[in-house]
Amino acid sequence: MWRKNLLCCVLVLSLTACETLEQKEHNDASDVHLQLGARYLSLGNYAAAKENLETAIDKNSDSVPAHIALAYLYEKLNKFDDARNQYEIVSRLDPENLSLQNNYGRFLCDRREFDKGVSLLEKLSNNLLDSTPWITVTNLGRCKLGMGDKASAEKYLTKALQQDPTYAPALLEMQKISYQNNNFQAANDYLQRYLMVAPQTPETLWIAIQTEAALGNTIAVKEYTQFLLVNFPFSNEAKQIKSSSPNK
């Protein structure tokens, strides 16, 4: 009898070891596809990113980073219901995940669900375990901007830049706020700081053109306009310039 029991134990242990090894192989494969998906996402190759992130989840359905990355990809593709679904999956898998709280809070504010988004981000901003508080505070600033509370937005964004003076999204938002407040020199200063850490976008160029025009810097206006038309010819900002040009 004891030999039979021992044999059963050995079989159970062997099966458990096989399952553990198989699961490890799946998890390792999931991590590889997650890294590939994130890389393709950063390069703007959304089709390849989607394929790899979905494979990562197929290999390991509990991969929180893969679900968060896929949610962000769906946002880029304007598939907001699919993005919400991914965020809600992560909420069930790991409700205390700080990256989830930050991204989901931002997502909710972008969808104009301000009460839910601000509540989630404010909770995170009081969490001492948050290793990137400037991102959280910037997202709070963006929420407040969406709500029309420019004063609170500026307060949060200023705090974010005190925590990380090189954080590009906060610099970009402060450039826009300064321009809207007719504080053109400050807008230009924030742009120059932004350009030290991030590339130009059609939006930054558009604000730069308006800012330099307000400051009377005609040479800079021509340079920024030319850069916009050459590098982003199909952007809405370039179309606006072309439509307003007397030589169109």
Which ranges hold each PLM region?
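Terminal, low-structured helical/coil segments at or just beyond the last alpha-helical repeat
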Residues: 196-248
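Structural marker of alpha-solenoid helical repeat scaffolds
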Residues: 25, 59, 93-94, 127-129, ...
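Bacterial Sec signal peptide processing site at the extreme N-terminus
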Residues: 17-35
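Register position in tetratricopeptide repeats
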Residues: 42-43, 76-77, 110-111, 127, ...
